[in-house]
């Protein structure tokens, strides 16, 4: 079955349990549900406010919504939010190392593909986290004319 083309992503601020917030927070450094075609397709957000000129993003796509461009659009929307708040930020992300036993970690590969397509890289090994060894990806600030368009935020 061919992958469907993703439509525009709308971000909806939410709390840690994915409950939509009644009002948008005063800063963008929060979590979001990603909506497309009238349904939740995934989500993402920031691990906290910027520190030392860097901010970290994380994102995901729900099963059944993968391979439709939602992950890339969500990550791109997070970049736009970060740079709209502070155009000098370097944005970082982490992905898992793929296992060496020949079994491919498809989530890590998909995420690496998204990050590469957005200009991140090259990845560097980072300290092991609670999920095991990870790669650290970085994207320095880009020229304003090359920054992604700001997403729609449901308020």
Pin down the residues of each PLM region.
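Amphipathic alpha-helical recognition patches that constitute DNA-binding helices
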Residues: 56, 73, 110
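Glycine-rich, flexible loop segments associated with nucleotide phosphate handling
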Residues: 105-111
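GNAT-family acyltransferases
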Residues: 1-56, 60-64, 81, 85-89, ...
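Conserved acetyl-CoA pyrophosphate-binding loop and the N-cap/start of the following alpha-helix
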Residues: 65, 69-78
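Conserved active-site tyrosine of GNAT-family acetyltransferases
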Residues: 115
């Amino acid at each position: 079955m061919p992958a469907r083309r993703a439509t525009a992503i709308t971000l909806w601020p939410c709390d840690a349990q994915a409950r939509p917030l009644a009002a948008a927070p005063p800063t963008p450094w929060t979590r979001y549900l990603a909506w497309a075609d009238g349904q939740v397709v995934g989500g993402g957000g920031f691990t906290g406010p910027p520190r030392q000129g860097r901010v970290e993003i994380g994102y995901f796509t729900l099963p059944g919504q993968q391979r439709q461009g939602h992950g890339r659009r969500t990550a791109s929307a997070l970049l736009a939010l970060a740079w709209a708040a502070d155009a000098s930020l370097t944005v970082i992300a982490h992905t898992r190392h793929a296992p060496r036993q020949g079994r491919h970690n498809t989530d890590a590969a998909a995420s690496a593909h998204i990050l590469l397509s957005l200009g991140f890289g090259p990845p560097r090994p980072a300290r092991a986290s609670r999920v095991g060894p990870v790669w650290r990806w970085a994207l320095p600030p880009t020229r304003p004319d090359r920054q992604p368009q700001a997403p729609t935020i449901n308020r």
